[in-house]
Amino acid sequence: DAKAANAWLDKIDNPQRALEVQTRRATLLARQGKLREARMLVQQVPERGPEDARAKLLAESQVLREVKRWGDAHSILVAASERFPGDADLLYEQAMMAEKLLRIDEMERVLRRVIELKPDHHHAYNALGYSLADRNLRLSEAQELIEKALQLAPDDPFIIDSMGWVLYRTGKNRQALE
């Protein structure tokens, strides 16, 4: 219930958490169909510096993703990536929204850029490898990417699942089940 959730949020009196609180409020509003109001709530949080500006853009895109407004979220993330060039995490989020919009070439290009900027970004290796395997393309490359992700985060269940998928796609059914 949105009213009860807002009552709990009212109890948080910490300026350091203002964006987090407003993002949660905005998500509640967006789920009620009040998207314009939700976005304004996030946009009106005061910025103390560039990191706050970046966080606000991520928060607004998160609210949009919650209500499956992939195109709007993607637009914000593209603008954020232009404003904060070289930010691997923003680029990763942009790639994930490109994938939702079926802009696979963009997703692949941006994920490769993420890996270039941040060679230990296991999510980027996994997303790219899984995407290739899911489309049954360049399976040896897909497996290499997922193996790299697994080296970086050996206990990540999503990466373990991706490895099973690529092994299945390459006909290694017994290994896939392990």
Name what the model sees in each region.
Residues 1-178:
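Alpha-solenoid helical repeat scaffolds
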